[in-house]
């Protein structure tokens, strides 16, 4: 690059700014823009060459041209940044255009889960009994033999203890007692009663397990059992509590309840509870709904209480049974086949 004096350098500097503007505008992408930048601002660029040539000028011209070259450098850098921004915006616009969402397409709603009908019954039962002062117990599903059977007055030779009726676990607890999957929720009542002082007023809903299956039975099923222990509890209290529960659960006063003598090792006397609707599709049919009775004195002793002082009643109902009657389902297995067409109707 050759020049004579400051005037020729001034013209050259002005021309470099114009050239830079043209080169930057012609750059179609970032790589081309960087090449154009090197032509003017690089180590071997035109402005660098001019700065090196300032030594050939006298001090006054050097000061004047140095200021002009710095000004040109700032102008070229401004042009460079503007072009960079323009290219970046163009790239963004192109990407957005290629990723455009067609808002005219029909939307896809998110699949919402629902409450299983048996769990819906569980929650409703809890709500009803809480409203009349009952607490809700919880406990382990893997239980020891004593809490599941012995504490509830089941003799050692009782058929329920056999492997044909109970799922045993190949383990023992810390006291050496055999472990099993609880066959009812009564063990939760045993644990609760041994940790609380009378009056004891509690229900125990939960999963239970027995070696059984069919249209009305399942190896895993749900129960709710109730217990009321105090000094002056009678069968009349049991009938009143359970009748009120049924009328509230089925939302109907058009039902009657009867007690049939029965036998359970943990109650004496014992009774099956039947109900009959006096209107509707089930009118006139007695339906078995629960087992019940006055808590056996030996069970009261196993609670750590004096049966001469404390008395009480207990009852137990299958949550699947209550659900089937409430919704008119005839086959229990439908609840656990995972058919969304069946289950979805309970959440509409």
Swiss-Prot record:
Binding site for Mg(2+): 268
Lineage: Bacteria, Pseudomonadati, Pseudomonadota, Betaproteobacteria, Burkholderiales
Span of the signal peptide: none
Family matches, as NCBIfam families: pheS
Gene3D superfamilies named among the record's database cross-references: Bira Bifunctional Protein, Domain 2
Domain of life of the native organism: Bacteria
Record note on cofactor: Binds 2 magnesium ions per tetramer.
Cofactor(s) essential for the protein: Mg(2+)
Stated family: Belongs to the class-II aminoacyl-tRNA synthetase family. Phe-tRNA synthetase alpha subunit type 1 subfamily.
GO MF assignments: ATP binding; magnesium ion binding; phenylalanine-tRNA ligase activity; tRNA binding
PROSITE patterns attached to this UniProt entry: AA_TRNA_LIGASE_II
Stretches that traverse the bilayer: none
GO cellular component, one term: cytoplasm
Reaction it catalyzes: tRNA(Phe) + L-phenylalanine + ATP = L-phenylalanyl-tRNA(Phe) + AMP + diphosphate + H(+)
Subunit text: Tetramer of two alpha and two beta subunits.
EC number in record: 6.1.1.20
InterPro entries attached to this UniProt entry: aa-tRNA-synth_II, aa-tRNA-synth_II/BPL/LPL, Phe-tRNA-synth_IIc_asu, Phe-tRNA_ligase_II_N, Phe_tRNA_ligase_alpha1_bac, Phenylalanyl-tRNA_Synthase, tRNA-bd_arm
Source organism: Bordetella parapertussis (strain 12822 / ATCC BAA-587 / NCTC 13253)
Keywords tagged on the record: Aminoacyl-tRNA synthetase, ATP-binding, Cytoplasm, Ligase, Magnesium, Metal-binding, Nucleotide-binding, Protein biosynthesis
Name this protein carries in UniProt: Phenylalanine--tRNA ligase alpha subunit
Predominant subcellular localization, coarse grouping: cytoplasm
Subcellular location per the Swiss-Prot or TrEMBL entry: Cytoplasm
Biological processes, Gene Ontology terms: phenylalanyl-tRNA aminoacylation
């Amino acid at each position: 690059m050759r020049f004579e004096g400051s005037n020729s350098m001034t013209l050259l500097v002005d021309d470099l700014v114009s050239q830079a503007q043209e080169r930057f505008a012609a750059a179609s992408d970032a790589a081309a823009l960087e090449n154009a930048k090197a032509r003017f601002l690089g180590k071997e660029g035109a402005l660098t060459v001019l700065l090196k040539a300032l030594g050939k000028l006298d001090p006054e011209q050097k000061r004047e041209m140095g200021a002009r070259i710095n000004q040109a450098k700032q102008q070229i850098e401004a042009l460079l940044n503007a072009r960079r921004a323009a290219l970046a915006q163009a790239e963004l616009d192109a990407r957005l255009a290629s990723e455009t969402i067609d808002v005219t397409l029909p939307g896809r709603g998110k699949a919402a889960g629902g409450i299983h009908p048996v769990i819906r019954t569980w929650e409703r039962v809890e709500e009803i009994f809480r409203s009349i002062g009952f607490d809700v117990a919880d406990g382990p599903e893997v239980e020891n033999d004593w809490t599941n059977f012995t504490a509830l007055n089941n003799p050692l030779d009782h058929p329920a203890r056999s492997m044909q009726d109970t799922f045993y676990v190949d383990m023992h607890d810390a006291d050496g007692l055999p472990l099993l999957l609880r066959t009812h929720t009564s063990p939760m009542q045993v644990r609760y009663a041994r940790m609380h002082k009378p009056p004891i007023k509690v229900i125990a809903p939960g999963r239970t397990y027995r070696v059984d299956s069919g249209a009305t039975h399942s190896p895993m099923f749900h129960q709710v059992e109730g217990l009321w222990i105090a000094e002056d509890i009678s069968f009349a209290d049991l009938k009143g509590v359970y009748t009120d529960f049924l009328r509230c659960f089925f939302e109907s006063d058009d039902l009657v309840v009867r007690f049939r003598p029965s036998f359970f090792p943990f109650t004496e006397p014992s009774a099956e509870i039947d109900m009959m609707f006096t209107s509707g599709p089930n009118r006139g049919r007695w339906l078995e709904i629960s087992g019940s009775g006055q808590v056996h004195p030996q069970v009261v002793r196993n609670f750590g209480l004096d049966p001469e002082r404390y008395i009480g009643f207990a009852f137990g109902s299958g949550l699947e049974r209550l659900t089937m009657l409430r919704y008119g389902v005839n086959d229990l297995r439908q609840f656990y086949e995972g058919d969304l067409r069946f289950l979805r109707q309970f959440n509409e």
